[in-house]
Amino acid sequence: MHSNVFVGVKPGFNHKQHSKKSRFLENVSSHSPELPSNYDYVLLPITTPRYKEIVGQVFKDFQRQSIQNWKPLQIPEPQLQDICIPPFNVKKLDNDDTPSYIGLLSSWLELESRDPNVRDLGLKVLLNECKYARFVGINKLILAPPRDLSNLQLYGQMIYRLLQNRIVFAAPALTISISLPLYEDSDPLATWELWNTVRKQCEYHPSLTISLALPRTRTPSYVLNRWLAEPVSCLLVSSSIFASNQYDYPVLHKFNQNLILKFQKVNGDSQILGNELCVILHGMEKYANNVKGGESAYLEYINYLLKKGDKVLNSNSNHQFLLQEDSRIMPPLKPHSDNLLNSTYLTFEKDLVKYDLYESAILEALQDLAPRASAKRPLVILVAGAGRGPLVDRTFKIISMLFMDSKVSIIAIEKNPQAYLYLQKRNFDCWDNRVKLIKEDMTKWQINEPSEKRIQIDLCISELLGSFGCNELSPECLWSIEKYHSHNDTIFIPRSYSSYIAPISSPLFYQKLSQTNRSLEAPWIVHRVPYCILSSRVNEVWRFEHPMAQKDTVQDEDDFTVEFSQSSLNEFKIKHRGEIHGFIGFFSANLYNNIFLSTLPNDSTVRLKFSEETLMNTRREENLIKKCDHTPNMTSWSPIIFPLKQPISFIDDSELSVLMSRIHSDTEQKVWYEWSLESFIYLMLSNYTSAVTAASMTIPRSIVTDDTKTLAHNRHYSATTNQKLDNQIDLDQDIENEEEQGFLSNLETGWQSVQDIHGLSETAKPDHLDSINKPMFDLKSTKALEPSNELPRHEDLEEDVPEVHVRVKTSVSTLHNVCGRAFSLPL
């Protein structure tokens, strides 16, 4: 199995040695002789400090020029002495073991400067470096994050201008990856929010990715899940986050082992342009003398970890099957109106787990029906939508097992003329022509015949379920069978099926649809496209059961009333801020008795739809919640996503109200889905002047005062306490029991790791660009966040003022796919 995860190193060397003359790093061993050659990439700066000095002098000259002799700023391209990566032997074609390069773009630039000339200088330097990288065949470049977040929009503007330049987007496109810590203790989603702001400014550009510096402390599960759905191209692993085991070898703590395994499991799905994920080690030379094995021990450990992860994933047959196919977004199938291809049937028939479950259901159903079967009055079994006959095969197997060959009559109905030919061949070769084949649409079968001439069936078996359960018209198709061909004791397999939705963040899904101009109002089937479910629960939206009507309560078949149209209002509570790109859909089905299949994610908490059955139950709320899992190793269905035309952002402790409708129109002869969204927050307000209320409702999230409190407070993960988040995953299971003796160095934050990657701890900022000595990355800047009006303090107000809970609407979407204008299913 190929995991698409590679290993890179940033060699330890002194940048100053390149400032006077060229000293190319033709191999890392010349600078780190302790390193073995078992790595795939070398991370090096594109240019040397010498180039920085040249550019600085050019900028000084530009600032000194007079108005009369003014000329636009011209930044020279780097010369031979100004580059770290040689213009030759970047990739030796005759030696696949030679590592490739990942480039570091200049980190001394101030892309967010308020001085337009400084920003212009930065952009021109980046374009020069990108031009050289393209020439020597480097396609992945890592960029330093902004230094001052109060000017983040200026930074994003320059990044987008860089991405829009032909030097970057011309095929094969370059990948620009912004380096950031995976999370901060004080605000775990702060770096994700930074990334999301820049990414949105750049309109989800496919060439923009993220490189994450692994933390030293355990990552909260909701933060990790958010990043797993993002286009992460590099994991930056500092030697400072390693511990030493009982043998003094460097090892990662178990939570970081699992973190890497989870990214390994994503398996390159997040790489839109096919760029593989790379784990980059850096700072190994700092602590080489403190561990056994020196620098090479770090590299050998990471390689061991990835190989172990490959074995774990390779042992999962379902994961192996998924790896055989590329990630893709597909329109839902319409088997009722379109004829499926032979290759589609073949793919579905490979899912032995599904057919094993069907076989078990058929066995139990025939055992229940057996007492009324005889040679004079054989049981009639209908396989509705037989396709190429896999369910007929399983039915014959059960009949032989129960010795009911003479007591059963089998009918297979299929409208696809090509599949019908296949059934004819199977009937002759395998079924001894004992199956009655009917080439017709099941919704029209014998509907014009007198009732006494219609075939009545005892068992109806079908596999008409789509990714959302009802989205391939199973209710409509089986209703025709029920109405015209069933009696009171007819058994249907499946007996019922439910549809479920949950709000998700899936930036790659949104990016792919946006870049290909595909409809954001139509539902899509997603295969191996990462997503993050934002709510704590998945909601059941509706359920269909068969039989759909009780015949013994109806005198005339024309009196049957069945609700094919369904609507559901769903409430979701979302604890952590984020952005919604749509709703993901799953289904579960009860085939017969206690035999179920499910496409819900493992360990899902499901809120069942409120029904009349629960109305009289005094403990109905408890009975509406249950745990569900995905049927192990079942591969027939991928999830369906109902997208939003515009992503919607929300803050911590938000509530969503989602309308999901299934519309069946006999007038227009089609079925379609419509959906929309509203978001809310709850505020706890004191009942005093409206001016104070209005002011308190506009306080930014990051400003917390004594006068403003939300109903549910933000809960931050803190490294200074031993508190663990309630919903945090315990990642310590199923990992080798390694005794860790402690960290190798003093505490190093994720931001320091990012600075180390870019060499910012060694070089000072040029004084001609900014004379103010401020931090490299100022995450605590709140210039733009200070409230303009000071609120009155509680001591100035009346005591014991009653509090009011206010539900405030924060956003609303349009109604999507109105009247089926983007997607519908013909009846």
UniProtKB/Swiss-Prot annotation:
Its EC number is 2.1.1.320. Disulfide bonds: none annotated. Gene3D superfamilies: Divalent-metal-dependent TIM barrel enzymes (3.20.20.150), Hnrnp arginine n-methyltransferase1 (2.70.160.11), Vaccinia Virus protein VP39 (3.40.50.150). One of its GO terms (molecular function) is histone methyltransferase activity. The active site is at residues 463, 472. The modification Phosphothreonine is found at residue 614. The keyword NADP does not apply. It is found in: Bud neck. Keywords: Cell cycle, Cell division, Methyltransferase, Mitosis, Phosphoprotein, S-adenosyl-L-methionine, Transferase. The modification Phosphoserine is found at residue 317. InterPro entries: Arg_MeTrfase, Arg_MeTrfase_PRMT5, PRMT5, PRMT5_C, PRMT5_TIM, SAM-dependent_MTases_sf. GO terms for biological process: cell division; cell morphogenesis; G2/M transition of mitotic cell cycle; methylation; positive regulation of mitotic nuclear division; protein catabolic process; regulation of cell cycle; regulation of DNA-templated transcription. It catalyses: L-arginyl-[protein] + 2 S-adenosyl-L-methionine = N(omega),N(omega)'-dimethyl-L-arginyl-[protein] + 2 S-adenosyl-L-homocysteine + 2 H(+). Residues 329-675 form the SAM-dependent MTase PRMT-type domain. S-adenosyl-L-methionine binds at residues 345, 354-355, 414, 441-442. Phosphorylated in a cell cycle-dependent manner. The keyword Cell cycle applies. The record marks 348 as: Critical for specifying symmetric addition of methyl groups. Present with 1180 molecules/cell in log phase SD medium. S-adenosyl-L-methionine-dependent protein-arginine N-methyltransferase that can catalyze both the mono- and symmetric (type II) dimethylation of the guanidino nitrogens of arginine residues in target proteins. Involved in the control of the cell cycle at the G2/M (mitosis) transition. Cooperates with HSL1 to hyperphosphorylate SWE1, thereby targeting SWE1 for polyubiquitination and subsequent degradation. Acts as a negative regulator of the filamentous growth-signaling pathway through inhibition of STE20. This is Protein arginine N-methyltransferase HSL7. It comes from Saccharomyces cerevisiae (strain ATCC 204508 / S288c). The gene is HSL7.
